[in-house]
């Protein structure tokens, strides 16, 4: 409702979107895990002791067998990526995919996009520049590449100026018992007590990732790696109130330049989140907690943890990550602040649409995948109905 009011998005009520969420969940086989790994169980124990509201995360991982390869490609095919379900379904309905093609430029002609200029890589690795004509063009290159392509093509109004993320701070926790987080999927319980500003949950774990998370204070922490079986990693994620920009690189490079300015509110929420997460983990049985903050010592007592409820973490020493990016081409009827209308049509063009993470007008404060897919399907249905 906040987005509807601020950006004047048409037909954006929960009851309008619900069928699209349901369709996406059905086709991705979204469900709760049958068994919770030890890294989840200890976290859940802390949540219950703190008395906080939480939920078990549903996953698009049909028949998961805990190979812990989610981030690099499931060897069993359990993770329901696009290649497992929606691409085969699209091909069944007549969609043709041109692979090895990289769109370099949108071709503009009198208020329309007549096609794209693409670089095609042949089997012998030679490349050709080709023109592909189209009656309608949908750009779905994600929160960073969609605005880069539009700006490279001379389309700049409210494009790439409102880049947003969910800043995340990770911690490693050392327990007395063996957790063996390296042998299972990431912890699957999320604390929602402080949502939408702050979320607490579990992070992907390998020995290499553990070493990276300890590297901010490596001289003090390096011996911990040999205790990896008794360790797990968790995160604080905040909604993100800062703003950033996305710009295409110069001189023909395919890279994008990303900039995000962490706000003072972000720092405050990250600090409070660290205090709460550390307290939860200590309650759950952790001996010590190691934040990804350079110069910050390990946290061994609740008194040390709650210090950050009132104090701010040193901004320059934070090692933050994110896996959620969005809002670079916001949609809505407010042409003074949006790049596209309520259904993704780019202002100033009759036949150019965006339909990906870039169109979310603001930070959702949750994993945006479901929202992106539901809104994209809604927009596609509207396009089809409008063209009949």
Language-model region placement:
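FAD cofactor-binding and catalytic pocket of flavoenzymes
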Residues: 156-281, 288, 313-327, 347, ...
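Rossmann-like flavin
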Residues: 1-66, 236, 261, 265
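Non-transmembrane alpha-helical segments in soluble domains
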Residues: 1-4, 18-25, 44, 87, ...
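Glycine-rich loop(s) and the adjacent beta-strand/alpha-helix scaffold that form part
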Residues: 92, 106, 117-190, 356, ...
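Helical element adjacent to the flavin cofactor pocket in flavoenzyme catalytic cores
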Residues: 60, 65-135
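A glycine-rich dinucleotide-binding beta-alpha-beta segment and adjacent secondary-structure elements
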Residues: 63-66, 70, 104-109, 286-362, ...
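General small-molecule cofactor/ligand-binding pocket signal
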Residues: 55-57, 96-98, 289
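A conserved FAD-binding loop/helix module that cradles the flavin
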Residues: 362-383
């Amino acid at each position: 409702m906040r987005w509807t009011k601020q950006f004047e998005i048409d037909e954006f009520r929960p009851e309008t979107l619900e069928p699209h969420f349901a369709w996406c969940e059905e086709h991705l086989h979204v469900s709760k895990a049958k068994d919770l790994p030890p890294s989840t169980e200890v976290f859940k124990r802390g949540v219950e002791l703190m008395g906080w509201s939480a939920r078990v995360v549903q996953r698009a991982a049909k028949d998961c067998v805990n190979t812990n390869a989610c981030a690099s490609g499931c060897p069993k095919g359990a993770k329901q990526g696009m290649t497992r379900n929606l691409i085969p379904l699209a091909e069944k309905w007549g969609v043709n995919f041109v692979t090895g093609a990289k769109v370099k430029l949108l071709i503009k002609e009198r208020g329309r996009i007549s096609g794209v200029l693409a670089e095609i890589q042949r089997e012998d690795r030679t490349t050709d520049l080709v023109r592909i004509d189209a009656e309608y063009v949908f750009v779905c290159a994600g929160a960073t590449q969609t605005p880069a392509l539009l700006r490279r093509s001379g389309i700049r109004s409210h494009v790439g100026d409102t880049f947003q993320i969910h800043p995340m701070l990770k911690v490693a926790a050392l327990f007395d018992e063996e957790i063996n987080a390296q042998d299972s999927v990431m912890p699957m319980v999320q604390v929602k007590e402080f949502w939408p500003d702050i979320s607490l949950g579990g992070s992907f774990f390998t020995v290499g990732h553990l070493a990276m998370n300890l590297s901010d204070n490596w001289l003090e922490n390096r011996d911990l790696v040999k205790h990896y079986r008794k360790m797990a990693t968790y995160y604080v994620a905040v909604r993100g109130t800062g703003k950033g920009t996305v710009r295409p690189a110069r001189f023909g490079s395919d890279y994008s330049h990303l900039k995000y300015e962490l706000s003072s509110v972000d720092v405050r929420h990250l600090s409070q989140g660290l205090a709460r997460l550390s307290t939860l983990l200590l309650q759950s049985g952790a001996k010590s907690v190691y934040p990804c903050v350079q110069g910050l010592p390990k946290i061994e007592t609740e008194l040390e943890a709650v210090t950050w409820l009132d104090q701010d973490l040193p901004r320059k020493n934070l090692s933050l990550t994110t896996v959620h990016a969005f809002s670079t081409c916001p949609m809505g009827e407010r042409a003074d602040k949006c790049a596209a209308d309520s259904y993704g049509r780019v202002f100033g063009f009759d036949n150019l649409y965006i339909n990906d993470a870039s169109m979310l007008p603001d930070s959702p404060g949750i994993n945006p995948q479901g929202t992106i897919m539901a809104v994209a399907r809604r927009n596609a249905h509207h396009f089809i109905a409008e063209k009949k």
